[in-house]
């Protein structure tokens, strides 16, 4: 089980054993990922076999609802096998004989049903309860059982907007949100929807869906990890005018434009054609400098306070980068206690 996690651990061991040949320090490796990759990074924090294989971690927009317990994982596996045409007695045989195209088609169908057939987790992700991943990663962080390395975690201001145009996997419409909340306590439903003024107006639904998919994970990870290790939280608000005009804004994955210096490319020049190039490059330089500094020292800048439960400082990347304290507190607290597994 959890074969992708085993692959990641093997890759990190290779890095440890070989990074010196490239001038690197095996004792100072930083891992970082975005979206499902950020979730993988957070999960590795709770993998005992990854002990000592990395010194810092960065989670950009970690996805929520991907971790399954054994019972939920079994339900998802049964559905997957059924889509492949397996019966009660030949699941393993059917799986081994399936063509790659059949596996992809079955997985696509399973993912498409995720919003209507919530089983306690989305259909892709790790399963806890074995020697590789003994417990839910956030639970391990809360208990102090995860790796106590410095962590950066954060989200983007308009996470959900991407999923109204592409990859329509998130609950960003009223019917999808009501299905999501249908198994929750009625008070929880009222509390969550009230945190998004104007619900069920479209913009409120999109903000709610984005928080469910990414905000909840970032908040939970930050709160759990900061009790035992240095934790820094950010929100990425910057978007050039072209992205605002398109209706996407600072949506999911747009921070990668800054991380990977895309604004210096032809594509980046097109995105910043509306007199935004200087601000885009400024934001990029700032973010990259902080990521580099963190990767070297575990500290992303003296002006970025460590996250605490009492003050909850968040560094906001924008035309004017600044620190805000517990932004969107009403949205954060509205989701407390809610999870797919508890529905």
Feature map (PLM): residue ranges:
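C-terminal, loop-rich substrate-recognition/catalytic regions characterized by aromatic stacking residues
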Residues: 146-193, 240, 278-282, 286-288, ...
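Alpha/beta-hydrolase fold nucleophile elbow
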Residues: 22-34
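Short glycine-enriched nucleophile-adjacent loop
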Residues: 38-50
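Active-site rim elements
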Residues: 1-2, 63-68, 128, 137-138, ...
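Alpha/beta-hydrolase fold catalytic core
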Residues: 183-217, 222-226, 232-238
């Amino acid at each position: 089980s959890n074969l992708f996690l085993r692959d990641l651990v093997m890759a990190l061991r290779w890095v440890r054993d070989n990074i010196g040949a490239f001038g690197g320090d095996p004792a100072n490796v930083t891992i970082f990922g975005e979206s499902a990759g950020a979730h993988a990074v957070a999960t590795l924090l709770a993998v005992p076999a990854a002990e000592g294989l990395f010194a810092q971690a960065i989670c950009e927009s970690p996805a929520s609802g991907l971790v399954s317990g054994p019972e939920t994982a079994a339900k998802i596996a049964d559905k997957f096998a059924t889509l492949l045409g397996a019966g009660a007695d030949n699941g393993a045989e059917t799986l081994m004989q399936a063509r790659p195209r059949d596996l992809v088609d079955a997985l696509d169908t399973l993912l498409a049903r995720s919003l209507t057939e919530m089983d306690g987790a989305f259909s892709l992700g790790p399963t806890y309860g074995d020697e590789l991943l003994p417990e839910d990663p956030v639970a391990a962080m809360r208990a102090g059982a995860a790796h106590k390395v410095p962590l950066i975690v954060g989200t983007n201001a308009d996470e959900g907007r991407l999923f109204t145009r592409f990859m329509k996997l998130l609950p960003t419409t009223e019917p999808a949100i009501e299905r999501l909340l249908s198994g929750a306590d009625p008070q929880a439903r009222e509390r969550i929807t009230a945190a998004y003024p104007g619900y069920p107006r479209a913009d409120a639904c999109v903000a709610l869906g984005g928080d469910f998919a990414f905000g909840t994970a970032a908040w939970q990870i930050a709160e759990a990890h900061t009790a035992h290790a240095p934790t820094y939280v950010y929100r990425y608000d910057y978007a050039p005018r072209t992205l605002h005009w398109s209706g996407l804004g600072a949506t999911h994955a747009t921070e990668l434009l800054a991380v990977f210096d895309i604004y210096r490319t032809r594509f980046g020049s097109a995105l910043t054609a509306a007199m935004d190039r200087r601000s885009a490059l400024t934001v990029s330089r700032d973010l990259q400098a902080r990521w580099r500094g963190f990767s070297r020292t575990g500290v992303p800048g003296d002006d970025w306070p460590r996250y605490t439960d009492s003050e909850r400082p968040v560094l906001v990347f924008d035309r004017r980068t600044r620190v805000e304290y517990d932004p969107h507190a009403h949205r954060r607290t509205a989701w407390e206690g809610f999870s797919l597994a508890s529905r």
